[in-house]
Amino acid sequence: MGAVRTALVDALFAALPVALVYFSGWAYLTSYLGQFGIDATQFDVSFTTVLVYAFVPLQSCMVLGAIAVIVVLGFIGFLIEFHAKEDSKGVRTVAASFGLFAVVLVVVLLFIIKAAATTAARDMSDNVWKGEKSQSVVPLVDPRKDDPSVKLYNACRDGRRLRQVIGLPNQLFLMCRSAVDECNRGTLFAVSSEGKILYSADKVREEINVRKICQP
């Protein structure tokens, strides 16, 4: 029974870091895309892409501090149980208490990561609206000149108002900032890897009436 328990604990500790990193990346990605009304579940996002974005919220001081506390408590619990060679009920109870507290902190850590991801995603979306993110121009393949979305796209391109939201292997999301209210309003374009406009949608920045991100 002890060997089974040890194997389960080892498996948990081995999988936990990967699960937390993946959760961090997915929380950031969904929050960031949600700022533009994009549902991340509607298209394929590779595992490596999620892992890359995971390091944005993981750099938060609150997240790093919580992780450090969990590691220290888990290590202390391990040392207590490791040195309890005899079947000391009191010592094992203390070790179990440390382990339980560490599990509770892991749950709390999920909420901390989510909060950090939301804050980082909002800051990154502000960079798009302020025009501080990279400008991207995707040539359209055989565009219909009379299509209103094509005309708007070309006007945005010529006015250097296109900013990349995110680039994926099969499509690219671009934000055309409004020529009148560039920090708050615009048009979102989804462009395929073949250079075709999949759809376009008018967008208004979230918290437009709460936060001003550009000087008047």
Task: Cite the ranges covered by each PLM segment.
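Extracytosolic and intramembrane catalytic regions of membrane-associated proteins
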Residues: 133-216
